[in-house]
Curated annotation (Swiss-Prot):
Its EC number is 5.4.3.8. PROSITE patterns: AA_TRANSFER_CLASS_3 (PS00600). Coiled coil: none annotated. The modification N6-(pyridoxal phosphate)lysine is found at K264. This is Glutamate-1-semialdehyde 2,1-aminomutase. Pathway: Porphyrin-containing compound metabolism; protoporphyrin-IX biosynthesis; 5-aminolevulinate from L-glutamyl-tRNA(Glu): step 2/2. It comes from the Bacteria. Its cofactor is pyridoxal 5'-phosphate.
């Protein structure tokens, strides 16, 4: 069966043929591939074509596809049972590792997705402060729950819609959307909504409008202004947690949030999410406190065992972060040089082992500047690269990721293929 035939079949049974909109490749004008398997830095489609993968399932596969360490741990857990609805030892071990690595939380609660982690963190913030409003930032994506699918990036930006039908205006009215990196707007919001703001929710490095780096003065401002106004600072580290550093963005930038949300890497490609905070906050979560949150599959042994294997590897070999950062810098420097030689305006925003190429001549510091990108040109670049065997995220507004399986040889091969893709632009 060809990719085209399989996708036509998928469309018969699933909306748009996908389980998540960006997978339809609509914004890049490409025929979607249907994956058969992944191995190391590669995926292979059902036609047998191999691609060097820089999506990595949108971030969780920091050790690459089908890592022996991860697969072995999953099989060990699976041999004991796939779900219990009761606390298991893998869950306890993973929670201990997350807490020790983060250095900013005392307790953690597992859920089944990043969306659930953020939903729970918002409820916790509102329950503690008894205030209604949440501040988020234009272009930051925090999952698809009603409270935060306002001014979102990622798939919503790709579809070109501001939110989605089905969310009552009353929900949106309690979410204040500001520009990323704008200190003045932040100050004005706290004046206008004095004593009504429960929390500021932020991706400390935006990854869902493409990679957008925070001004460090702005991050510090977030911390200071929330403390001054008895509001909580929530870091959505679903992408950046264990990606920027062992302690995530909190460690990388030296800013301590009140609540941290995790996902992706802590499950190694299995469904998972988590949120954590200091004891005085987490003691308000049921069953210790009155703020309710629950889930049948939360902390399921397969997901937490997978995450446990990854975190143990990262803790044992902390130099992984430096190696990945150096490899990313080599890739992006050479890629930028190729684009410049071709006379193509671009900006590459990069940090640790993640980056985004924006086809624009403007510095990208927020969603407005990200949207100056030539998305049609990106689409052509994507299609050219796909033909050459390089799989990048199928949206201008997503991050590329590297894994430990991306060796120097793999990156050199990538650059050879991308040179051909660029020459055809």
């Amino acid at each position: 069966m060809t990719n085209k035939e399989a996708f036509e079949l998928a469309k018969k049974y699933m909306p748009g043929g996908v389980s998540s909109p960006v997978r339809a490749f609509k914004s890049v004008g490409a025929e979607p591939i249907v994956v058969n398997r992944g191995f190391g830095a590669f995926v292979e489609d059902i036609e047998g074509k191999k691609y060097i993968d820089y999506m990595l399932s949108f971030g969780p596969l920091i050790l690459g596809h089908r890592s022996e360490i991860v697969v072995s741990k999953i099989m060990e857990a699976l041999d004991k049972g796939n779900s219990f609805g009761i606390t298991n030892m893998y869950e306890i071990e993973l929670s201990e590792l997350i807490i020790k690595a983060s250095k900013v939380i005392d307790k953690v609660r597992f859920v089944s997705s990043g969306t659930e982690a953020v939903m729970s963190a918002i409820r916790l913030a509102r329950g503690i402060t008894n205030k209604p409003y949440i501040i988020k930032f234009d272009g930051c994506y925090h999952g698809f729950s009603d409270s935060v699918l306002v001014g979102a990036g990622s798939g919503v930006a790709t579809l070109g819609i501001p939110g989605t039908p089905g969310i009552p205006k009353e929900f949106a009215a309690l979410t204040i959307v500001l520009d990323y990196n704008d200190e003045n707007a932040l100050e004005e919001a706290f004046i206008k909504y004095k004593n009504q703001i429960a929390a500021v929710l932020v991706e400390p490095v935006a990854g869902n409008m493409g990679v957008v780096l925070p001004k460090e003065s702005w991050l510090k401002k977030l911390r200071d202004i929330t403390k001054e106004n008895d509001a909580l600072l929530i870091f959505d580290e679903v992408i950046t947690g264990f990606r920027l550093a062992l302690g995530g963005a909190a460690e990388y930038f030296g800013i301590e949030p009140d609540i941290v949300c995790y996902g992706k890497i802590i499950g190694g490609g299995m469904p998972i999410g988590a949120y954590g905070a200091k004891n005085h906050i987490m003691e308000r979560v049921a069953p210790e406190g009155p703020i309710y949150q629950a889930g049948t599959l939360s902390g399921n042994p397969i997901s937490v065992a997978s995450g446990l294997a990854i975190l143990k590897t990262l803790i044992k070999d902390i130099a992984i972060y430096d190696r990945l950062s150096e490899l990313r810098a080599y890739l992006t420097y050479t890629l930028s040089k190729m684009l410049s030689e071709k006379g193509i305006p671009h900006r590459i925003n990069e940090i640790a082992s993640m980056f985004t190429i924006f086809f624009t001549d403007k510095d990208v510091i927020d969603f407005k500047s990200a949207k100056t990108s030539d998305t049609a040109l990106f689409g052509k670049f994507f299609r050219n690269a796909l033909k050459e065997g390089v799989l990048m995220p199928p949206s201008q507004f997503e991050a590329w990721f590297l894994s430990t399986a991306h060796t120097k040889d793999v990156v050199d091969t990538t650059l050879e293929k991308l040179k051909k893709a660029i020459d055809l632009l």
